[in-house]
């Protein structure tokens, strides 16, 4: 029997749901602080160091569309993560990895620019929830492997 956490969800599902909520809060911060305008400055600085990275502009509409789509995908896939659908678990792992990198990126940006950058206030939340989801995915994978009987040499051949 799986341990249940708040709302009667198992730990992975609850943490993945929190990841979606953290991303929603993060997107709100980024929108209100106009990350889409700062994007030109940040990618320009990166382009100076790594010319292969293009300096990029983003309209507020494009930014909102991308963020709302990402949040909808995260929260919409919660029932499938709960059902342990392989595609949803893969998505959960990719999303968690993206959020860990997102949290690191905003924090690094604040250090690099020596001050506030859009998104840095909520960056720790997306980072931590990303780590928690990855941890649960690894733990679940270990439990599945531990419960799966190993095949004898004869059965493998």
Language model segments and positions:
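Alpha-helical transmembrane segments of multi-pass integral membrane proteins
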Residues: 107-146
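Interfacial segments of alpha-helical transmembrane regions
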Residues: 6-22, 86-95
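Intrinsic disorder/low-complexity segments
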Residues: 143-157
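Transmembrane alpha-helix/helix-exit interface in multi-pass inner-membrane proteins
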Residues: 21-42
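A loop-to-helix transmembrane entry motif
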Residues: 51-71
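Perimembrane loop-to-helix junctions flanking transmembrane segments
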Residues: 40-55
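Membrane-helix boundary connector in multi-pass membrane proteins
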Residues: 85-89, 93-96, 103-121
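Juxtamembrane helix-break-helix junctions at the cytosolic face
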Residues: 72-89
């Amino acid at each position: 029997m799986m341990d249940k956490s708040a709302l009667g969800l198992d730990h992975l599902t609850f943490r993945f749901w929190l990841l979606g909520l953290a991303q929603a809060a993060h997107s709100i911060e980024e929108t209100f602080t106009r990350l889409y305008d700062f994007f030109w400055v940040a990618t320009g600085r990166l382009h100076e160091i790594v010319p292969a990275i293009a300096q990029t502009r983003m309209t507020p509409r494009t930014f909102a569309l991308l963020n709302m789509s990402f949040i909808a995908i995260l929260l919409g896939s919660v029932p499938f993560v709960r059902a342990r659908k392989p595609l949803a678990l893969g998505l959960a792992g990719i999303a968690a990895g993206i959020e860990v990198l997102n949290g690191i990126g905003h924090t690094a940006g604040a250090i690099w620019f020596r001050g506030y950058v859009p998104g840095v206030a909520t960056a720790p939340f997306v980072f931590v929830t990303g780590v928690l989801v990855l941890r649960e995915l690894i733990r679940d994978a270990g439990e599945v492997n531990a419960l799966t009987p190993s095949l004898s040499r004869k059965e493998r051949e």
